[in-house]
Amino acid sequence: MNDNATPSLTPNTPSEASPWLFCVAPMLDWTDRPCRFFERLLTRRGRLYTEMVTTGAIRFGSRDALLGNSRVAGPTALQLGGSDPKELAFAVEAAAPYGYDEFNLNCGCPSPRVQKGSFGACLMLDAKLVAECVRAMRDATDKPVTVKHRIGVDERSDYGFVRDFVGEVYDAGCRTFIVHARAAWLQGLSPKENREVPPLMRSRAWELKRDFPDAVIVLNGAVKTTAECRALLDEVHDGVRIDGVMVGRAAYQTPWMLSEVDSVLYGESCRTLTREAVIAAVEAEVEQYYACLLYTSPSPRDGLLSRMPSSA
């Protein structure tokens, strides 16, 4: 990567900020409806993503339970898992009444279960199919259709591989790419290990922005603080800046960092809710919507008091 900065460029300002300036990643068993309600209490501007929802679940399951997005104001994206263009188009149409601002195709999950369904990271090995999926989804909605992907698959981790993948999908009309800056290893690593073992190569995001200047490029991968987000957004390489940053585990491990997003990244006033008030609001939301469920998802509220003087 060329580290020569271009002094004439200025940092992103709120008036010109990309809609994808700050995003919270789709995370299985985490970013369900109560979690997104919780996140929205902390940031008005951040873009929130659902858990991945498969096309089969939407066709055969309870759509209100899977897609309900009530009381989660602000920009929210539905992430879909699938590889059949017709089924993805059906899922997009079925989700239309629920008010999502974006439909995202998962091309990054490496889990064996997802691979058996022929979607997730293994889709990167068939860029033409991904392009067909994107075209079908775009034909079914006027909302943005985006793709979240890795920078490589197994031994295919050279820049040319991800560049050609993005190029094929770009030609299908996709203009926003969320780049998880690690390769996916489809054999031999667990999903958790796939988030930690493959080398982090953030430079790929700037290389893609250089080669696809009209695309929105969002960097995902081990981003932990709003200060780090700000620094990454201000970095200039090869004369370009990336358009956005996506955080993952930090959003539930140290969720109070989300309360800094609007001020640090958008120049707006901070939230005034206390941690205790946020916890009370989330508990009321969970009681209202999930009192009848027979399972309990892990809650990001568990991290609200982390790093406080009285916390362990």
Task: Name these PLM-found stretches.
Residues 29, 149-152, 216-227, 249-251:
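Glycine-rich beta-to-alpha transition loops that act as phosphate-gripper elements at the mouths
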Residues 5-12, 16, 27-101:
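Glycine-rich, positively charged N-terminal anion/phosphate-binding segment
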Residues 254-269:
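C-terminal helical cap(s) of enzyme catalytic domains, especially alpha/beta-barrels
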Residues 93-103, 135-211:
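Alpha/beta enzyme core
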Residues 24, 39, 78, 105, ...:
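Conserved, mostly hydrophobic/aromatic
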